A protein has these predicted regions:
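Sec-dependent N-terminal signal peptides
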Residues: 7-15
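Extracytoplasmic cell-surface/polysaccharide-interacting catalytic and binding patches
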Residues: 18-95, 99-265
Length: 265
């Protein structure tokens, strides 16, 4: 049963027609032909054996991620801790979420809210990057009155440091402001894709996020696809046609030359 639940997003993705998913008591969400629910792309749940616990000094509360993510997370947090411009300490929190955890998160809001309203704060289960084990939320301590996972994160020096440096450690911001995906701006939510495709584990992460990266670009992003600018077109001018000699003038010149030849004889 657990294995089947992990593959539910894939089954939804290949459905021929839109379906309705019952997520909470009295709340259903329409799943489009492209597999998206309320703007969110489908993702399967990471197998438990592919996740490891992050060291306690990296996170606020329990945090399980792919091991290759933790290696770069350690480097990022160490670099941030050594930079006084951060004005605090960065931590990870809310790392991997199972489908059941995501359902609990999605349904925890007020029962009066519609699925659309709920999706503003949380992705529907089966449609969260957190399920992959490659995504996490960042927070700062001391909090200074800014709750975790709130827009006030963007006003912190720590966020400005992330925006300038996170890509160097393989992290990119999934949901920038005014994103085409139609998902709420989340300055705290970052996914790992590796510093390059050749980095350990990066190829798999980039495969899982390929559609998101292609259709709904992260910003800041890791090695974004270069913009191909077509070469400037230099107009070429056709050579001017050669002027045809005027036959009348040629004959007159020929007659003059003939008279000159006869006089020389």
């Amino acid at each position: 049963m657990t294995r089947m639940r992990r593959h539910i997003p894939l089954l939804i993705l290949f459905a021929a027609t839109p379906v309705q998913a019952q997520l909470c008591n009295g709340v259903s969400v329409s799943i489009g032909k492209d597999g998206r629910a309320l703007g969110h792309l489908p993702y399967g749940d990471a197998a438990p054996g592919t996740l490891v616990a992050a060291p306690a000094y990296l996170a606020v509360g329990p945090c399980r991620l792919r091991p290759e993510v933790i290696a770069d997370l350690q480097r990022l947090i160490a670099a941030a801790a050594g930079d006084p411009a951060v004005q605090g300490r960065l931590y990870a929190f809310s790392c991997h979420r199972s489908l059941s955890h995501q359902q609990s998160t999605f349904c925890r809001t007020r029962e009066s809210e519609s699925g659309v309203d709920r999706a503003i704060s949380a992705a529907p289960p089966g449609h969260s990057e957190h399920a992959t084990g490659y995504a996490l939320d960042f927070t700062v301590r001391p909090a200074d009155g800014c709750p975790d996972a709130e827009a006030c994160m963007a006003a912190k020096p720590a966020f400005r440091w992330l925006a300038a440096n996170a890509a160097r450690y393989g992290f990119e911001m999934s949901f920038p402001a005014s994103n085409k995906q139609g998902v709420k701006w989340e300055p705290w939510h970052w996914r790992w894709v590796g510093v390059s495709r050749a980095a350990p584990g990066a190829a798999r992460a980039r495969f899982l996020f390929a559609r998101a990266r292609r259709d709904f670009a992260a910003n800041p992003a890791v090695d974004p696809a270069p913009m191909i600018v077509p070469p400037a077109v230099v107009p070429t001018l056709a050579p001017a046609p050669a002027e045809e000699p005027i036959k009348g003038k040629r004959k007159k010149k020929d007659r003059r030359r003939d008279r000159g030849d006869r006089s020389d004889r």
